[in-house]
Curated annotation (Swiss-Prot):
Phosphate binds at residues 20, 24, 43, 87-90. Coiled coil: none annotated. The keyword Transferase applies. The keyword Cell cycle does not apply. GO terms for molecular function: purine-nucleoside phosphorylase activity. A purine D-ribonucleoside binds at residues 4, 179-181, 203-204. HAMAP family: Pur_nucleosid_phosp. This is Purine nucleoside phosphorylase DeoD-type. Homohexamer; trimer of homodimers. It comes from Streptococcus pneumoniae (strain JJA). The active site is at 204 (proton donor). The gene is deoD. The lineage of its organism: Bacteria, Bacillati, Bacillota, Bacilli, Lactobacillales.
Length: 236
């Protein structure tokens, strides 16, 4: 057991999907995994291990924001030996070419957070995805016919930002979307020498405000990113 995860050693696979919403973790376990067993209910942050196409895979919620995903991802890596971590979550488009329900693969993650600068105050340490996972995910998504964008995202500490126009400006610099976790996940992956990737479904748009989705859709649909994430985890 770790401080925030109740699993015993061996109950978590070395490959894991990380949705922010614990109910999305439950949905993935019930709809994609065979013989799924719940290994964590602490703070209702549900975690499950089962098999996908014969491969042992886990899924666990992380909550919202970089402090929360940092807690769970670090414990999964350090205490349970997880080697491949793929975040599957939602993001808001910052680019007019990126639309609701399309996928974004975060090649890198800019951030307004101090989560990295606390460790490296004199450097701008780049948060980048595992190229192996990114390459596999991109080709899998294309083979499945999914509209997929690859590029930089913004990982923000603030959901209700007072810097809305600044965020919009980033879209003009090629930033695809804004979310709240990828930079912290990539930083931990670099620190502990594991592979990480963030796959997001666009749930709303900051540049096309008429495009949006419901809370129920965000919890129970967006299955394309789940399929891509699982296929990427088991790809040789």
């Amino acid at each position: 057991m770790s401080i925030h995860i109740a699993a015993q050693q061996g109950e978590i696979a070395d490959k894991i999907l990380l949705p922010g919403d614990p109910l999305r973790a439950k949905f993935i376990a019930e709809n994609f995994l065979d013989d799924a067993v719940c290994f964590n209910e602490v703070r209702n942050m549900f975690g499950y291990t089962g098999t996908y196409k014969g491969h042992r895979v886990s899924v666990m919620g992380t909550g919202m924001g970089m402090p929360s995903i940092s807690i769970y991802a670090r414990e999964l890596i350090v205490d349970y030996g997880v080697k491949k971590l793929i975040r599957v979550g939602t993001a808001g488009s910052l680019n007019e070419e990126v639309h609701v329900r399309e996928l974004v693969l975060a090649q890198a993650a800019a951030t307004n957070s101090n989560i990295v600068r606390n460790d490296w105050p004199q450097y701008d340490f780049p948060q980048i995805a595992s190229f192996d996972l990114l390459d596999k995910a991109y080709h899998i998504a294309k083979e499945l016919g999914m509209t997929t964008h690859v590029g930089n995202v913004l990982s923000s500490d603030v959901f209700y930002s007072n810097y809305f126009e600044k965020n919009i400006e980033l879209g003009k610099w090629g930033v695809k979307a804004v979310e709240m976790e990828a930079a912290a996940l990539y930083y931990l992956a670099a620190q502990y020498h594991v592979d990480a990737l963030a796959i997001m479904t666009i749930s709303d748009s900051l540049v096309n405000p008429d495009e949006d989705t419901t809370a129920e859709e965000r919890q129970n649909t967006f299955t394309d990113m789940m399929k891509v994430g699982l296929e990427t985890l088991i790809a040789e």
